[in-house]
């Protein structure tokens, strides 16, 4: 599936998280091991300044992160207001979430309810749960692939 272009300013910091060998030209390709432009342990505080990132591409990486709250909070912390987060995650509606032995968190489309400001779950629980992330949902689709794999695709906009 081809990536939908994300409109952002020229020369802006754009992160391709969990890039593995799928480097994107013009983006900062990030992984926990080489080859990557930045080697980082994303389970810790991320090595970018607050409000410094114009876009994040996160395809098939968030399921490798133990804490959904930490991951989404760090995305929000480093993103500029209006920055776009492009997510692509296998969901528990299919086998993709469970087939890879390195997956440690399991996602459904409803998980976004806790990070998107228009949902009652975010409004009721974000303070109690320690969720500082606040997004608007620009686009969300749930896609079926061969071998009973379902994936969530979402474009979220950072709200500050």
Predicted region positions:
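Conserved SAM-binding loop
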Residues: 10-93
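Conserved alpha-helix/loop element of class I SAM-dependent methyltransferases that forms part
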Residues: 1-12
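S-adenosyl-L-methionine-dependent methyltransferase catalytic module, highlighting the catalytic core
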Residues: 66-76, 80, 84-160
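Generic detector of short, locally flexible boundary/turn motifs and exposed helical patches
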Residues: 2-4, 20-23, 122-123
């Amino acid at each position: 599936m081809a990536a939908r272009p994300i409109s952002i300013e020229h020369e802006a910091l754009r992160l391709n998280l969990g890039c593995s060998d799928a480097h994107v030209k013009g983006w900062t390709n990030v992984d926990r091991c080489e080859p990557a432009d930045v080697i980082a342990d994303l389970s810790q505080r991320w090595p970018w300044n607050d409000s410094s990132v114009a876009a994040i591409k996160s395809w098939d990486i968030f399921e490798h992160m133990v804490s959904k709250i930490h991951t989404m909070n760090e995305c929000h912390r480093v993103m500029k207001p209006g920055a776009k987060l492009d997510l692509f995650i296998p969901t528990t509606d299919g086998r993709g979430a469970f087939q890879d032995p390195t997956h440690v968190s399991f996602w459904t489309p409803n998980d976004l309810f806790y990070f998107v400001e228009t949902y009652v779950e975010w409004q009721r629980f974000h303070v109690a749960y320690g969720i500082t992330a606040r997004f608007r949902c620009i686009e969300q689709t749930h896609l079926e692939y061969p071998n009973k794999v379902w994936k969530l695709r979402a474009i979220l906009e950072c709200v500050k």
